[in-house]
């Protein structure tokens, strides 16, 4: 698959089937993240790969949090996506004290590389932010002291790729001066 094709075919997939995402494919996805550009070459990311019972544990932490704190119930649809995923990758910012915008932009580039690599491999993916409701619990559970949870990427095979969403025309999103 060519890059432009992967960009056009990338979708936020939230419904996954039971097929396993192989360790080999996960490593390709992480290698793509590793090669992302980063501000000042700081590479401020650490990835925690979760499978099987660990995914159920994250789901249960989300459910427990939502039961205790009504304001977090907006994450309920996300919790279902988490539970259906074959693989979760927690993306931590290893340098939260540095310029947040630089670190978050760098991490965003790494995540986009992951999503495009997953697309190229025929694996569904979705970039999740709502796991922030259990950031403290995740940091403690997976020993990520001093780090900040930036996002979670859910991966899995799918039976049906979601339809593309409408996009603004190029003329509506740019200004060109010469």
Q: Locations of the language-model features?
A:
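N-terminal amphipathic, basic helical "cap/leader" segment at the start of enzyme domains
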Residues: 1-85, 178
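C-terminal helix-cap and adjacent tail motif
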Residues: 6-9, 148-178
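Cyclophilin-type peptidyl-prolyl cis-trans isomerase
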Residues: 79, 90-91
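Structural motif
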Residues: 86-88, 125, 148-150
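Short beta-strand segments
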Residues: 91-92, 154
